[in-house]
Amino acid sequence: MMEKKRDFLSLFDVSDVELAMLIRRAEELRFVRQMREPHATRPGRMLALIFEKASTRTRVSFEVAIQELGGHAVILGRNDSQLGRGEPIKDTARVMARYCHGIMVRTFGHDVAEELARYASVPVINGLTDLLHPCQVLADLQTVYAHVANRETSPSGQAPDVLSVLRSVRYAWVGDGNNMANTWIEAAGLLGLDLALACPKNYEPDAKILAKAKGTGKGKIHLTQDPREAVSGRHVLSTDVFASMGKETEAEARRQAFAGYCLDQKLVSAADGKAMVLHCLPAHRGEEITDEVIEGPASVVWQEAENRLHAQKALLEWLLP
């Protein structure tokens, strides 16, 4: 009897133990690639990559990931499929599942990803929606784990427990209560993390996601409008653009609302002395983060970007039959 297919639309689609397993496997795959060892563990698998939103990191990392695992990617942009011409999502889902072993979608409405998953008989991965960005936060958590566990150069010795390491540090989010903030809230609720978020009034995270995360009874989630309060003594600082894709018309209003929320050196200095800085990219330097910080010693942004590849390989290995 075939096992029921799994989707990855939200961090809550996995358990804390499964998430830790994915992070550990992502680290193994990182070292395997550094050693230039072949790791074609999913030969012949076909992955559909559907993009209603433009992409750099998501497209390249998923395409490289499936190819290095021995599979192939079929890439569909907004003008390449009937989705952009009004075909029902459920029809696209059923057809793509007949051709491919998995579907990754990067779109605006989270309901699109949910409907694809509902009707596709193969795993569906959320490459980004306006509500959530679980693949990015999976890579972010891998980055935090590797940095804290001092495993950036060698896997020698027994690797520290993933969940213990992740729970040993305190996290801060500064900026828009967007899909990244929402997903960090999910991470806190799932893994039991200590998370503070600083967002301006009227730009808070999704209330339902916040309630669900708090409802787990795990971790600590604190909301404030004071960036300095949020970062004080924290070990991990994260931010994102103030005007996400699709919000460009609000850019000027958002710049005014987010005055004082820029992750600059003064704000970083209020965090723990060994704090690390994350940014999912692309960055608008001088707006949500300064050039000095993103290029500075606290930044782990480039390893974070690379880890999208390794984390998504681990995810594809786990999800694809």
What is each stretch, according to the model?
Residues 52-65, 149-151, 161-239:
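Glycine-rich phosphate/diphosphate-binding loop of Rossmann-like nucleotide-binding domains
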Residues 1-60, 64:
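Positively charged, low-complexity intrinsically disordered leader regions
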Residues 214-292:
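Rossmann-like adenosine-cofactor binding region
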Residues 112-129, 249-271, 297-298:
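A short, gly/pro- and small-residue-rich
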Residues 69, 99, 119-120, 191, ...:
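Short, structured coil segments at secondary-structure junctions
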Residues 274-275, 280-321:
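Adenosine-phosphate binding glycine-rich loop
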Residues 36, 40-145, 285:
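Phosphate/diphosphate ligand-binding glycine-rich loop within oxidoreductases
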